[in-house]
UniProtKB/Swiss-Prot annotation:
Native source species: Escherichia coli (strain K12)
Record's GO cellular component terms: plasma membrane; type II protein secretion system complex
Lineage: Bacteria, Pseudomonadati, Pseudomonadota, Gammaproteobacteria, Enterobacterales
Subcellular localization: Cell inner membrane
Note: Part of a cryptic operon that encodes proteins involved in type II secretion machinery in other organisms, but is not expressed in strain K12.
Protein name, per record: Putative type II secretion system protein M
Sequence ranges on the Cytoplasmic membrane side: 1-16
Amino acid sequence: MIKSWWAEKSTSEKQIVAALAVLSLGVFCWLGVIKPIDTYIAEHQSHAQKIKKDIKWMQDQASTHGLLGHPALTQPIKNILLEEAKRENLAITLENGPDNTLTIHPVTAPLENVSRWLTTAQVTYGIVIEDLQFTLAGNEEITLRHLSFREQQ
């Protein structure tokens, strides 16, 4: 039956039917296979990115609240503290103290800058402030009399 139907068709009709069959197969493959797979991959990549973002946020929160240890320092604590002090426009001098500690020479600086510097040292690098002594030096300034640091154990 199909053979006789096909035999009755002219060459141009056979070409049109063959072209429509190929086109139909292409549309089926695109809409039935490729597009769903592409959508599936995009959704899962988006989900994976959200999970990575959530994990990073959780690690940051845990680190901020002291629930996770800090990564090992890649440079000496003295270099880190001096670099961060420079970012906060603090002119400080550090000396090596007893038991792997660092001490600061007395310096007068804006309270806000000192506060940011100490917060960065603690939160970002896990540097422990062992001793802090200061006096008020004027309008929103303090004089650091004594300050000693050590790396978190």
